[in-house]
Amino acid sequence: MAYVPLSGTDVRIFSNVPFSNDYKSTRWFTNADAQYSYFNAKPRVHVINECNFVGLKEGTPHIRVNKRIDDLYNACYMIFRNTQYSNKWFYCFVTRLEYVNSGVTNLYFEIDVIQTWMFDFKFQPSYIVREHQEMWDANNEPLTNTIDEGLNYGTEYDVVAVEQYKPYGDLMFMVCISKSKMHATAGETFKAGEIAANINGAPQPLSYYVHPFYEDGSSPKVTIGSNEVQVSKPTDFLKNMFTQEHAVNNIVSLYVTDYIGLNIHYDESAKTMSLRDTMFEHAQIADDKHPNVNTIYLKEVKEYEEKTIDTGYKFASFANNEQSKLLMYPYCVTTITDFKGNQIDIKNEYVNGSNLKIQVRGSLGVSNKVTYSVQDYNADTTLSGDQNLTASCNTSLINNNPNDVAIINDYLSAYLQGNKNSLENQKDSILFNGVMSMLGNGIGAVGSAATGSAVGVASSATGMVSSAGNAVLQIQGMQAKQADIANTPPQLVKMGGNTAYDYGNGYRGVYVIKKQIKEEYRNILSDFSRKYGYKTNLVKMPNLRTRESYNYVQTKDCNIIGNLNNEDLQKIRTIFDSGITLWHADPVGDYTLNNEVR
């Protein structure tokens, strides 16, 4: 029980004091004069100049009031002092009224330890469980606060924004990789089968052709150095790749990609792109039977480059809320996806800076591979530029979907081209050996014919090599093999994967999808935070007066010292450990009051 003096003077009994001895709320003052003025302005129920307190020994302090109990029904608070000893005011809760007789009422009370000792105790750094905190910085950016509140926020999100970002808008690249060069460099003579080893990130022997195009089948205007190149349509490019003699069976990979690993200069409105002539050259693939194909040949790339896409303010599109914490994860989340099975979730509060920037990396490899990472995500401010770049790779979306274009292997053309001279030599050999057989040189000549035959001569297998008739059968067998090859359908040696589905449905680049919890839960959590602040879990000085209207404070084993009796001091500690709202404005208990940071 709190300490109670033996007697009091200037006893004043009030009504309409808006807090009680449960200590859920109290009025907080900056000085004793403001405190006295607040209570003294409350409606007075009764005044006693001087009285003795009874029941102190039993722990039930009360005073006898010469007033009917009906006249005291609304009495809820009392203040007094003892002018014989000091001018200190004691503040008390009226706890009970007891009928004595028609003109006398016992009024029971207990000391309000918070108001009585408000200016006699002070906090030391204490473990703060929860309190009202600063929510926004000087630039009106939400301060990071991600401590779990332990509250239900639902199981579903509302999608509030979806934006698609492509490295070069509608521009795409078809990458064709061949075993050898398919064109002649200006001023040189074309040599079929020439291996043109070069640097493509690393030394390698393949030849790379890059063919830019749009989804409508057109191509951009291309400038390489100071030379303009009119690139062929992608359909013309493909048609000729599988008909020209030195291109058929030369192609080892063919795929479509959004980014070739180089931050090229591209004007989307003018549909023009510029390439460095140190890296690329104009390639004209031609033979004497088919139209020329204009495309771009990769000369050399020593190091690839990233491209940065600025998607705008990282908290844009989320519902406005006075509680900054509701912009944090898990209440808000940004998903980056390509809708091809590759996805990362971003906690916006851990993106350094105001804007969400996506870094795109790629290459001209044997298959598609493009990565999308968030710039300066979870990167400490002490990291350097290169270290920041590396750190961002730690959280990346990697699109290594093949995006292949089907490669047709024309078996007939391949066989005829690769074995044309051999076939003619086999025919001559068979005829010669057939004649020699008739002259008696049979089995040795037939054995050489069998050795040179790609088909396997029937007579060779059975040992029948005795006449020119057998030679005719061999030639017929070889021609039948050629006919069989001609009747074989073209084979797909590299399937196209889901390229048609992905690109035909517009699934290119990445999508930035912003999601937040349902409005129902936003309102619940907002109301809770407005009333009780945020979890803090820090050892610090509590925020006792940092808001316009009220501060909630809850501690654990709080460290309070003061010039007062130990019993009351311990009770004050218990009150703050239980949590209390300190009101700075009236009406106390009105949580609709403006409660911005002071």
Curated annotation (Swiss-Prot):
Q: Per its UniProt entry, which superkingdom is the organism in? A: Viruses
Aminoacyl-tRNA synthetase is among the record's keywords: no
Task: Tell me the InterPro entries matching this sequence.
Answer: Gp9_C, Gp9_N
The record, for Pfam families, names: Caud_tail_N, phi29_gp9_C
For this UniProt record, the keywords arranged alphabetically read as follows: Late protein, Pore-mediated penetration of viral genome into host cell, Viral genome ejection through host cell envelope, Viral penetration into host cytoplasm, Viral short tail ejection system, Viral tail protein, Viral tail tube protein, Virion, Virus entry into host cell
Which GO BP terms, alphabetically?
symbiont genome ejection through host cell envelope, short tail mechanism; symbiont genome entry into host cell via pore formation in plasma membrane
- Keyword 4Fe-4S in the entry? The reply is no
- The primary location reported for this protein is virion
Q: Where in the cell is it found?
A: Virion
Please give the GO cellular component terms listed in this UniProt entry: virus tail, tube
* Family according to the record: Belongs to the picovirinae distal tube protein family.
Q: How does it assemble?
A: Homohexamer; forms a hexameric tube structure with six flexible hydrophobic loops.
UniProt function note = Distal (knob) tail protein that plugs the end of the tube before DNA ejection and forms a channel perforating the host membrane during ejection.
Query: Any idea what this protein is called?
Result: Tail knob protein gp9
Recorded source organism is Bacillus phage B103
Gene name as annotated: 9
